[in-house]
UniProtKB/Swiss-Prot annotation:
UniProtKB keywords: ATP synthesis, Cell inner membrane, Cell membrane, CF(0), Hydrogen ion transport, Ion transport, Membrane, Transmembrane, Transmembrane helix, Transport
Disulfide partners: none
Protein name in UniProt: ATP synthase subunit a
Spans traversing the lipid bilayer: 12-32, 70-90, 104-124, 130-150, 169-189, 191-211
Organism per entry: Syntrophus aciditrophicus (strain SB)
PANTHER family xref list: ATP SYNTHASE SUBUNIT A, CHLOROPLASTIC
SUPFAM superfamilies: F1F0 ATP synthase subunit A
CDD domains registered for this protein in UniProt: ATP-synt_Fo_a_6 (cd00310)
Length: 217
């Protein structure tokens, strides 16, 4: 799918331009919502209250009350991924999350925050999480744990990229094969996949951060 001409830039990759576009859109929505807050909410305010309330409940249920401090980051990532995924369904637009670099940027932020939180909460004892339950397994467990942690950002990035980019390819092929019969149910499926992939990225991010705060056994 080709980028819209007004968003095309020969010096900046298209996924970066669309990421900026979505960030500007979310900031604008936030400012409009803040200025237009009412006791009796309108449709837009009600919709956003449901979305943000759902994110808040998800963070609390997954991470407990300690997770409240991470709500701004998790909610921001969730909104960005959701809007990015859905943007690709609009003719002429691209999903930034269909590019591996966009997803890797978010995954690296989660990776760095995870270990920063672990060190901040546990100090030097944080390394115990990499050593396993008994001392004689340390030579085996440390490489395994290091690899498992280093793979996390790669897993987050590739999972989201594969599902979103793969979905776009399937939709494009089906549009060519049966442009009048298949698109509508496939688009509903794409919306569902977009929601699921947003939740998966959020849940895994929260689980990684919550795991870093737990005591090593």
């Amino acid at each position: 799918m080709h980028s819209l001409s007004f968003l095309a830039n020969p010096y900046v990759p298209s996924h970066v331009v669309y990421a900026w576009f979505i960030m500007a859109l979310l900031i604008l929505c936030g400012l409009l919502l803040r200025r237009g807050m009412e006791i009796l909410p309108g449709s837009f305010q009600s919709f956003m209250e449901v979305v943000i309330g759902g994110f808040d409940s998800l963070v609390t249920d997954t991470m407990g009350h300690e997770g409240k401090k991470f709500f701004p980051l998790i909610a921001t990532i969730g909104l960005f991924i959701l809007v990015s995924n859905l943007l690709g369904l609009v003719p002429g637009f691209e999903s930034p999350t269909a590019n591996l670099n966009t997803n890797a940027a978010m995954a690296v932020v989660v990776f760095i925050l995870t270990h920063y939180v672990g060190i901040k909460v546990h100090g030097g004892k944080y390394i115990k999480q990499f050593m396993g339950p008994v001392w004689w397994l340390v030579p085996l467990m440390i490489p395994i744990e290091l690899i498992s942690h280093l793979v996390r950002p790669l897993s987050l990035s590739i999972r989201l990229f594969g599902n979103i980019e793969g979905g776009h390819i399937v939709v494009a092929v089906l549009f060519l094969l049966a442009p009048f019969l298949v698109p509508v149910p496939i688009l509903f499926l794409k919306v569902f996949i977009s929601l699921i992939q947003t939740l998966v990225f959020m849940l895994l991010s929260m689980m990684y951060i919550a795991g870093a705060m737990e005591e090593a056994h």
